[in-house]
């Protein structure tokens, strides 16, 4: 009987650990950052479109991220999370790669990061993790500033788990 109980307790702990990790915003943003770093250093080069806007093109290594959804969709698959890469345009951050959908069911490319607590933190070079509204939906989210080789903020990475 003791062996059966121990096996069941170990299985329950294993499931709890997997569930906690799968929905841990800090672990998910760390995974997104690792995926981007594996591609290469962040940089801006030229311009591209994001929805109806012309914005700087953001690259990781030689891969342009604007309108490329491989990384954000991989994060969704691995963590059941939304993910976005924003590029800095003036004093705004514009979505250039995202799996966040608009109310019409389209990717939110070209929409801006709302000026909220996350915006304030990343604008100052700090991470933000907490509850936030993204295009009308509540999320437990993390945002990190994306910096180029000189340390200049050129964008933002985001992940969110629906509440």
Where are these regions (language model features)?
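Conserved beta-strands of PAS-like sensory domains
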Residues: 59-64, 137-163
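Gram-negative bacterial Sec-dependent N-terminal signal peptides
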Residues: 1-20
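Short N-terminal helix-loop-first-beta-strand/juxtamembrane motif that initiates sensory/input modules
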Residues: 28, 33-46, 72-93, 129-131
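Extracytoplasmic/periplasmic sensor domains and loops in membrane signaling proteins
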Residues: 66-80, 97-136
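Residue-level signal for well-ordered, solvent-exposed loop/turn and beta-edge residues enriched
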Residues: 92, 106, 150-152
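N-terminal leader/targeting segments
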Residues: 21-22, 126
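Extracellular/periplasmic ligand-binding regions of membrane signal-transduction receptors
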Residues: 23-65, 100-104
């Amino acid at each position: 009987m003791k062996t059966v109980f121990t096996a069941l307790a170990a299985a329950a702990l294993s499931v709890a650990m997997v569930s906690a990790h799968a929905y841990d915003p800090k672990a998910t943003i760390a995974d997104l950052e690792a995926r981007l770093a594996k591609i290469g250093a962040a940089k801006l080069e030229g311009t591209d479109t994001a929805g109806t806007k012309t914005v700087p093109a953001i690259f990781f290594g030689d891969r342009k991220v604007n309108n490329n959804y491989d990384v954000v969709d991989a994060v969704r698959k691995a963590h059941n999370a939304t993910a976005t890469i924003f590029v800095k345009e003036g004093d705004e951050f514009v979505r250039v790669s995202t799996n966040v959908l608009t109310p019409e069911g389209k990717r939110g490319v070209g929409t801006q990061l709302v000026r909220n607590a996350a915006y304030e933190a990343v604008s100052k070079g700090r991470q933000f993790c907490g509850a936030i509204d993204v295009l009308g939906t509540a999320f437990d989210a993390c945002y990190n500033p994306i910096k180029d080789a000189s340390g200049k903020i050129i964008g933002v990475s985001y992940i969110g788990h629906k509440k």
